[in-house]
Amino acid sequence: MFKMQKYCKTATWQNLFGFINGKAGKTSYDNSYKESGRALSLRSQTWLRKKKLHCRFAAKIGGGSEMETKNFVFCFAFRSPCTIFVPKKKKMAIIPITSLQHPGVEIFSTLTEAQLRNRIEPTKGIFIAESPKVINVALGAGYEPVALLCEQKHIDGDAASIIDAHPDMPVYTGSRELLATLTGYTLTRGVLCAMRRPMAPTVEEVCRDARRVVVIDGVVDTTNIGAIFRSAAALGIDAVLLTPNSCDPLNRRAVRVSMGSVFLVPWTWITQLPGELHDMGFQTAAMALTDDSIPIDHPLLAKIPRLAIIMGTEGDGLPQQTIAEADHVVRIPMQHGVDSLNVAAAAAVAFWELRDRQG
């Protein structure tokens, strides 16, 4: 029998059937060894099904070897005893707070968005994601968590899976009233996560395989940025480029409004507009009301292989130089005397009408 460890369970049956996701079923260890025998006892079946952990089963068959499984159980038929290894859970770093001055919580309270972004040292930048759904989207996209802030009830509730997956991450918890004071608003979704800001990719990296991109020029409203990203993700935009005078997509409110879409669509900053796009073979379409603009449903636009849609603010619109340098100037036909839409609404219309129909 293999060497026992304190956190091990031991099976000493002569032969075992496999149990996969709680269902009895046969399995073979390799091409040369086939199972036979009786199933696990009911008690052992129940114990195994309750352990939603990464379990390692080591069965001494022939020379002895092992196989790892996740979230489901394989039990091998064998002719000698085996040990079931269940790794210990690391102790979670739960930190109760009773004061706004508690060390470590300043990233959720006193630091401004500019300080969190840390333009001087981008690798030290932080952003805040709110709600378990948005946090999980960020984690799934590869973003690194730094710390979690939540009400006590969420530790074993909505935030449990996040905490379990990152046992070394500090988790700050306090009363609903204290957390509302700390963050400046009531945590209706109950969970905030400070996450590491990655280095921004280059325009070439983001646009390498893209056919439809949007350029956001000077849009500073966080709600509009979040809404544009959500529409971009939903309607098939391959990448988002922003001029430096635009709002940071990882602003807390922008992330919240986007429902995590900022983590789903590649994005970066662009400084050479439209030169960098032309160098990569893109044609540009500036959204503006001019005498020579063409309607957004013009057949010519749908045939363009690589198209960059440039959008400005609702009030000031795009700079005249940007419009003059664009390959096309495009407008959305409107009725009842309305001459413009909110930039987020206009973006949704443009993304749908100018979507890639060839891919």
Describe the role of every protein-language-model region.
Residues 167-184:
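A glycine-rich helix N-cap at a beta->alpha junction
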Residues 87, 92-152, 247:
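Boundary-proximal intrinsically disordered activation/regulatory segments immediately upstream
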Residues 3, 7-9, 29, 33, ...:
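Short, positively charged and aromatic/hydrophobic N-terminal segments
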Residues 140, 171, 196-292:
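RNA substrate-binding interface of SAM-dependent RNA methyltransferases
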Residues 286-338:
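Active-site/ligand-binding-proximal alpha/beta "capping" segment
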Residues 193, 231-235, 244-263, 320-359:
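Structured adenosyl-cofactor binding patch, chiefly the S-adenosyl-L-methionine
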Residues 131, 220-228, 341-346:
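Amphipathic alpha-helical repeat scaffolds
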